[in-house]
Amino acid sequence: MLFRSHGAAVIVNDPGVGGGGEGGDAGPAQQTADDIIAAGGQAYANLASVTDPIGAASIIEDAVQRFGRIDAVVNNAGILRDTIWHKMSHEDWRAVIDVHLNGCFNVSKAATPYFREQQSGSFIHFTSTSGLIGNVGQANYSAAKLGIVGLSQSIALDMARAGVRSNCIAPFAWSRMTASIPAETPEAKERVERLKTMSADKIAPLVVYLASDAAQAISNQIFAVRKNEIVLFSKPRPIRSMTKAEGWTPESIAAELIPAFTPDLARADEVSAHVFPYDPI
């Protein structure tokens, strides 16, 4: 809806599957498109799955055929199949990677020829602190979301000469998907209660900004939105180094390097709640 209020025509893609990718329902996409049209905007509902390259391409083709061009792609399709690592099935791994990472690739790839031809465009990919920091029971989701960061960085570098930008957002929000996250421990239940206070409409202003010409100088960045707080993440950078002229041995690493590095080592059990321990603002 915020895109509409800023003059953008919108292709609403949502096959209407459940939180784990099951089923399908035209209702969510069509309802959103109808709401945009009722408010005086232009919109069209596309029900294709981003996991299918042809379906992903149809999202872009619908935009070009109905509205004449495409200026921004928001890759936010997602499902969850959370389970502890030793119980995760190959199917649960593939399904989550396919929607998040492959879906991001498929839609972005389909838009790229148009962006190159017009020498402009903006990719906005949804990542997660589950990938940036880590989370229990989400090996598939974490891998996909960190993979999206790598994809975005490469797109930003490869497409800069064509005037195309690529950025990531890690959203904190209660949604149809996050509602399916198991909450069995006190810590998980506390996280869910925090998420319930954060709505998706708080993410929209940054998405619209990054899609706009006002953000022409912004690319290859990782942001997060947590209610009224916008966060800029650093990329991994060296924080300590140690040189030994004669080279290292396993014994000297244990005796010298690890004690020197220990104050700066990340905690082994670190999750998002350790980095964001405070209530959303």
Residue ranges and their predicted role:
Residues 189-281:
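C-terminal helical subdomain
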Residues 1-2:
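Short, small-residue-biased leader/transition segments that mark boundaries at the very start
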Residues 128:
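Residue(s) in the substrate-gating loop at a strand-loop-helix junction
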